[in-house]
């Protein structure tokens, strides 16, 4: 897709919000905006949020329960595209089952992805909808959710569900642009640094141009 002059909504969690960066303009989507002369790159990232609903509400961190689908209503409806970047918090601290690939039960991860895609297609008809799979992270093979799925399982099912719905995917998990053990790029093993966001931006922009 052409990026120049475009408006893109970026819906995500702490990485999209910019945790780990030193300034807003250092976030991957703002880097892309400036480099490719986009009109707007709207930041709809909220730290700690998940794609799926939570069975037991999160104490003290209630904003974590503002799922992607709940927040989709506030996004700019005139955008040319929506980029969804999530799943790592569903893996990291979600309490719902992984679910079945054809489910629309938002109290499962698979169901919530299906439901989110359905909503985005309704709200943004004839617009580009693109999902990005989670980046590699430390403890990605130490699941806490009830079905003991690894982060690799989450990434794989996002790809599979998106293919089913004919939705674009940037498979960052497969591309693996950032080593979570590299302290310069990912200091805490999860949130990229300014330099990490620059690396991400290059990869994401290249893939967006191909979609």
Tell where the protein language model's regions lie, with residue ranges.
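Conserved SGNH/GDSL esterase-like catalytic core that processes O-acyl groups on lipids
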Residues: 2-9, 15-107, 111
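Alpha-helical cap/lid subdomain in secreted, periplasmic
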Residues: 64-211
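Conserved G/P- and acidic residue-centered "switch" motifs that form tight phosphate/ATP-binding loops
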Residues: 12-13, 193
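Short alpha-helical interface patches
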Residues: 10, 17, 173-177
């Amino acid at each position: 897709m052409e990026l120049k002059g475009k408006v893109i909504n970026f819906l995500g969690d702490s990485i999209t919000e910019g945790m780990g960066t030193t300034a807003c303009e250092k976030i991957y989507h703002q880097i892309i905006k400036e480099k490719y002369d986009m009109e707007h790159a709207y930041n709809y990232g909220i730290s700690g949020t998940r794609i799926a609903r939570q069975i037991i509400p999160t104490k003290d961190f209630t904003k974590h329960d503002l799922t992607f689908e709940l927040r989709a209503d506030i996004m700019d409806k005139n955008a040319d595209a929506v980029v969804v970047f999530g799943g790592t918090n569903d893996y990291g601290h979600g309490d719902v089952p992984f679910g079945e690939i054809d489910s629309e039960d938002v109290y499962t991860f698979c169901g919530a992805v299906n439901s989110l895609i359905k909503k985005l297609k309704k709200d943004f008809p004839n617009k580009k909808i693109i999902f990005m799979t989670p980046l590699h992270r430390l403890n990605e093979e130490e699941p806490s959710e009830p079905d003991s799925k690894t982060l690799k399982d989450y990434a794989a099912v996002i790809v599979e569900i998106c293919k089913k719905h004919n939705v674009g995917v940037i498979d960052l998990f497969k591309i693996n642009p950032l080593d979570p053990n590299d302290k310069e790029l990912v200091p805490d093993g999860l949130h990229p640094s300014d330099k990490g966001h620059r690396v991400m931006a290059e990869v994401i922009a290249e893939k967006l141009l191909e979609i």
